[in-house]
């Protein structure tokens, strides 16, 4: 009898090892390896002309794959949730965001965390949904293209295809996915975001210069050095384009607190979970500027369902813009919506090329 139990135990151990090895091999051979620069398809037709001296409007909005609304928490932020209980949450939020796009009617939308096919959002193609009724062009760049994310162990994230999307009414001459350095080492790197910039080169009426626009989603959970390196890559690109005589804007979810945020108004009250690093005070060169609404939060911690009030909620200002000296900020405003469709608020910017 003892020998029988020993054989059973050995068999169980061997089976576990085999399963582990299979999983290891799947991670190794299915990891997404994008090129440093990849040409991105531009869908649709432009409907407006960008002109120097005229106002243009932009909104950046991290959609939280339309699954992280104010009824949700998230396991990587100290909560327990992996996905909503059913697809209704996703379809409801998608309908709301489509309506938001139509009612705001701005020239450019910079969206982050847009799923095209993922277990966490019930395989709903959110990119197709948000671009469906938009009068202009659209481009999409992958940040997640993972066959299977094997955690949490008993309720895995599973398959994820997701990225950033830019909707643009102006004439986009070229769109490019630019890879950013990873903030992770293997094997975690295999199942985490492959952060990138979605660059668009926009024609300007009567000028050989271009507006170079970056849709930004920097790392949230990796090492501080990796986050700093990603920001440095972005800024070096922006400075190079400005030196060529172009106009340059970067907008999105920086996952870093902007200089000038009032730490008394938006304090860190939860040090056990996600805490964004701060961009150094003197980071920008002379003449460059942030376009940030310092009065309203752009994101919340997903350690629990939103209480409905800012009191006792961990809030951040991590979404906004960086502008080159030849781009004038006319106004910038965070549009508060009670985190109804995402864990982020949209941020609206009005600019003028000067």
Predicted regions and their residues:
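N-terminal, active-site-proximal structural segment of metallo-dependent hydrolase catalytic domains
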Residues: 2-132, 136, 140-155, 161
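Metal-dependent phosphoester-hydrolase catalytic domains
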Residues: 3-11, 26-46, 238-249, 255-354
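A well-ordered secondary-structure block
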Residues: 36, 146-211, 215
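Active-site beta-strand/loop signature of hydrolases that rely on acidic residues for catalysis
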Residues: 57-63, 93-123, 167, 200, ...
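Solvent-exposed loop/turn segments at secondary-structure junctions
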Residues: 65-66, 115-118, 144-147, 172-173, ...
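Surface-exposed cleft-lining segments at the edges of enzyme active sites
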Residues: 80-86, 114-116, 181-189, 217-225
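Conserved beta strand-loop-helix elements of the APE1-like EEP
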Residues: 132-134, 159-175, 312-328, 352
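Conserved S-adenosyl-L-methionine
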Residues: 138-146, 175-181, 331-335
């Amino acid at each position: 009898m003892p020998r029988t139990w020993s054989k059973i135990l050995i068999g169980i151990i061997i089976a576990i090892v085999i399963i582990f090895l299979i999983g290891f091999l799947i991670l190794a051979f299915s990891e997404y390896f994008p090129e440093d620069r990849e040409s991105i398809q531009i869908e649709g037709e432009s409907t407006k002309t960008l002109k120097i001296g005229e106002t243009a409007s932009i909104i950046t909005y991290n959609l939280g794959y339309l699954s992280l609304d104010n009824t949700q928490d998230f396991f990587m932020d100290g909560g327990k949730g992996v996905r909503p209980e059913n697809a209704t949450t996703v379809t409801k939020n998608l309908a709301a965001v489509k309506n938001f796009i139509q009612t705001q009617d701005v020239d450019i939308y910079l969206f982050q965390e847009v799923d095209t096919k993922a277990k966490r959002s019930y395989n709903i193609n959110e990119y197709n949904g948000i671009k469906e009724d938009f009068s202009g062009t659209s481009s999409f760049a992958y940040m997640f293209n993972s066959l299977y994310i094997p955690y949490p162990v008993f309720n895995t994230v599973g398959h994820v295809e997701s990225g950033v999307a830019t909707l643009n009414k102006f004439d986009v001459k070229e769109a490019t996915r630019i890879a950013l350095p990873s903030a992770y080492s293997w094997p975690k790197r295999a199942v985490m975001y492959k952060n990138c910039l979605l660059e668009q080169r926009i024609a300007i009426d009567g000028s050989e210069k271009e507006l170079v626009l970056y849709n930004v989603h920097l790392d949230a959970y990796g090492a501080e050095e990796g986050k700093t390196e990603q920001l440095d890559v972005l800024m070096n690109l922006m400075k190079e384009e400005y030196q060529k005589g172009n106009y340059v804007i970067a907008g999105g979810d920086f996952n870093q607190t902007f200089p000038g945020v009032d730490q008394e108004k938006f304090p860190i009250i939860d040090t056990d979970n996600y805490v964004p690093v701060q961009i150094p005070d003197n980071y920008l060169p002379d003449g460059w500027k942030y376009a940030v609404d310092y009065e309203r939060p752009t994101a919340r911690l997903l350690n629990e369902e939103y209480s409905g009030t800012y009191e006792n909620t961990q809030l951040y200002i991590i979404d906004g813009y960086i502008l080159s000296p030849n781009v004038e900020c006319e106004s910038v405003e965070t549009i508060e919506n009670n985190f109804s469709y995402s864990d982020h608020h949209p941020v609206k910017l009005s600019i003028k090329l000067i």
